[in-house]
Structure formats: C-alpha cells, structure tokens
Amino acid sequence: MKTLWQHCHVATMAQGVYSIIEDAAIVTSGALIEWIGPRSQLPSGEYPAVNDLQGAWVTPGLIDCHTHTVFGGNRSGEFEKRLQGVSYAEIAAAGGGIASTVRATREASEDELFASAAKRLKSLMRDGVTTVEMKSGYGLDLASERKILRVIRRLAAELPISVRSTCLAAHALPPEYQDRADDYIDHICAEMLPALAAEGLVDAVDAFCEYLAFSPEQVERVFIAAQKLGLPVKLHAEQLSSLHGSSLAARYHALSADHLEFMDEADAIAMAESDTVAVLLPGAFYFLRETRLPPMEALRKHKVKIAIASDLNPGTSPALSLRLMLNMACTCFRMTPEEALAGATIHAAQALGMAETHGSLEVGKVADFVAWQIDRPADLAYWLGGELDKRVVRHGVESSL
C-alpha cells in the first residue's frame, strides 16, 4: 500500500551529508521508498494513507554498527573498584574482567540471555535505532558462541529492528586454552566458524587484533577461514597499540576496522583504498579515560568513511544511547554533527554491508526513518540524554515500543 508522509523537513544523508529537503514529502510503497522530494513536486495520485508529520525533521533510522549486546552478568562492581584504586590487573587476577563475563555468559540460559539483551536493545530502539549489529565473543567455545548467536537471531525475529549477527570467537583467549592461542585459532577456523556458518547464524566475522588478544598473523588465519566460507570480515584494531591491524583489514577488504585510536596515516591510506569504514567508538574512549585520539585529520584527508557506534558491552562501554555517542564523537573527537549523523546512518550501513538498502533516504531504499520534533538535525548530537519526541517508521510502518 502507498503511504504519504508529509509536512516535514528531511535530512536524507545521501552521499554522507545532510542533503536537506525543506517542506518535503515521502511516499512509501510497502517497505520501500517510492518517492521523496519537495512537497510542491509531489506526484498527483491517490494515497490511501496520509500521515502529517507536523513539521518534524526526518532522518534515516539510526544504525548502531558495533555492539556486544548479548552477555551474562554485570561488571558495575568492577567499575566501582577501579574508581577506588584497584587496578585492572588486580581485578583480572581475582577472576574479574572479561573472564567474569565469559563465566556468566556460559552459565546463563538462552532465555536468560535473551531477556537481558532485549532490555538493552529496547533502550537503543527508544533512541531511534532501527538497525543494529550484535557480536558474539563472550562464549569462546562452540556451544556458548552458538547460544549467543541463537539469541541474536531470536532478538531479530521478536523485536521490530533489523539485526546483523557477527561471530567474534577471536575476542579473547578462553581459560581452557591458556597459553595456547594458536591452538584456539585453529579451533575457531577448523570447527567453530564452519559449524556456526552452516547453521546460518553468522553474517560476518570479527576478531580482536591487539597485544592482549591476537596477533595480526593469527587474525589473518581467521580472515582466510571466514572468506573461504563466503563471510565478510571486520576487525577491532589499534585500540591500545599499533599493530597495523587496520591495514590488515584493508588487505582483506574488511567491511570495517573499529576503535583505531593508534592507527597511523599509512593505515588510513590503506583503508581508503579498500573503502573499509573506520568505526569510531567514543563510549569506550570515554569510559576508559583514554587520551590518544583517533587520527581524525588523516581519516578526513584520505576520505575514509567514518561511522560511530555505541560498542555496548559490560566492560568498556556500557552505553545504552547511540545519540549520546554522537555527542561524544563531537566533543571528544571534534567531529561535526553532520559527520556524526552520517556516522550513525549511511556510513554505519556501509560498515554492515547494507549501504545499498539502508542508511539514507533515497528512492528504492528501505523505508526506515525517524521523524524527530527538533529544531535542526544538529540537535541529535547536541542534547545529552533524555528521550526526544519522535515517530519511528520501520519498513514503511510506524513502530512503537
């Protein structure tokens, strides 16, 4: 059915800029955008359903392209200890850190993981998020990684949001493989990835390239295994040190390389040449009180597309608001509100391999958009917290939580 949405202004985000249409109208047909433009040029015809958006600013639905939404337990106690002077090493030695999340996730049932993740996901959805990526990586064995990925598929089936599922088995070394990282990588490549891919649980494969995780050589083995299975790759890279993981990601035409505080200009050039998206995660930068900024000028100079995501996770970015991340990207990384909004729409879509169908408001694309009662698009990165008055449309149908 054709539906007309009118009396609005639109920031289409085509080509990664606002691309504003004043006094606009949008015609949707089923789940797709059939026409968009100035209301004065609206094609004549019958529109069975007409919606008055009352002067709202319409943007594409927000896309959170890097989250770890599904996990067991809670690490707020560790947060408190760190602020009382206990070091991360001491916390880890006492069984805390990522090991505690792995234990809690392994012990939790699928239903328990679903219930806790659904609450977190609904918080993102109330922020205007219509598409989200979720990673495994807190199971670190086949059964537990499968459990997480099954929960991700279930969330996609039961909540009105589009979901991409990423296997991050190469996130950390599980306790049963202590001091045997190469053996664990072998297990991922030979057993875990083929089994999980065969079950249709994986849309992409990620890894953590860092001195406290996996080496570039080990990550490359994961990439080769993923590509043999026809799966695109992504990478956590250059968060804490420079191992040139982002250049490795570019060599394998990764969808994205994420974090990137320690990347250099050569890495930026490599990413530009492969059109690999730089996903910046200001929540983790803020929460860890980091001081090394991503090389914004190099990214801009070489025209690397920049996305912004929440990195929602229990250890380093317990962030339930993507809009807050837009503000942090502006205040911490000195991005403009326009760059930040592109980072949570069209560039985030590219980081998920979805830019042909999502991320901007153009004819033929999926009709996912938000009508915000705001004064200008920059308000999305300006206001800190709180719920903005809005209407959310997903696949051409108004959605509510």
UniProtKB/Swiss-Prot annotation:
Pfam families: Amidohydro_1. One of its GO terms (biological process) is L-histidine catabolic process to glutamate and formamide. It is an enzyme of class 3 (hydrolase). This is Imidazolonepropionase. NCBIfam families: hutI (TIGR01224). The gene is hutI. Its EC number is 3.5.2.7. N-formimidoyl-L-glutamate binds at residues 138, 313, 315. GO terms for molecular function: imidazolonepropionase activity; iron ion binding; zinc ion binding. It comes from the Bacteria.
